[in-house]
Amino acid sequence: MRAERTAIVSGAGKRVGAFIAEALVGDGWTVVAHVHHSEDQVAEGTTKVVADLTDAACGAVIFDAAQNLPPVRLLVNNAARFAWDGFGEFSALQFDAHMAVNARAPALLIDELTRRHSRGDALVVNLLDSKLAAPNPDYLSYTLSKYTLAGLTELAARALAPRGIRVNGVAPALMLRSSGQSEENFEAMHANNPLGRGVEPADLVSAIDYLVDAKTVTGQIITIDSGHRFLGLERDVQFVGDA
């Protein structure tokens, strides 16, 4: 049974984060749903917490929302910044902004979990990107930030195993239409992989469920991409489809 356990999900007000939070509630978890804006909606049955992930105090703010709830046994670092830059258009501002949200905030949240974890087991799931297994230089700052998060996954797993905290990553392929991507392109590219099956948010939830139950798995990255990485594409999928 997973009752009397709390899960914290960052970026839980929209897209995949909202799907994860709702699924966890349905599976019996007490869920703290982080959002960036006070007007952001969250899944029914969750506890909403508003925090700016670029703020160094974000970890404490988010975990304070779980202070009177059951012990935190799951942290899903889902929130991510995804904005364009690339070689020839590289932006120091974009780099810093991506690193703050996609790498530093997860580190702060993991550190806060470490400070507050007293006994029992806990799991951190960092959401990565399947492009790390078949990289291309599009969305450069975003990609670099996800590489950093992948490194954090192993470092934290090594450091926190003696405390009973497991740290793993899940790296999904395209699940929902990206910003700037046409609906036509998404439909064409979603199932453009060797298995011929587009990755869905439910597949991501299944991977998280597996990691919750796999008590001896830590420091691993699960790529869920229907073999998309085998295609070895040189551009982001939205550009390939429009070529």
Predicted regions and their residues:
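Conserved glycine-rich cofactor-binding loop
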Residues: G13
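Conserved glycine-rich Rossmann-like NAD(P)H-binding loop of the short-chain dehydrogenase/reductase
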Residues: D27-Q41
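Conserved NAD(P)H cofactor-binding loop of Rossmann-fold oxidoreductase domains
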Residues: N78-W84, G227
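Substrate-binding pocket helix/loop in short-chain dehydrogenase/reductase
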Residues: G86-F87, S91-D96, M189
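Catalytic loop of short-chain dehydrogenase/reductase
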Residues: L123-T148, T153-P162, L174
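Short, small/polar-rich loop/turn modules that mediate ligand/substrate recognition or access, typified
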Residues: A161, R166, T218-Q220
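C-terminal substrate-recognition "lid" of short-chain dehydrogenase/reductases
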Residues: P201-I224, R229-F230
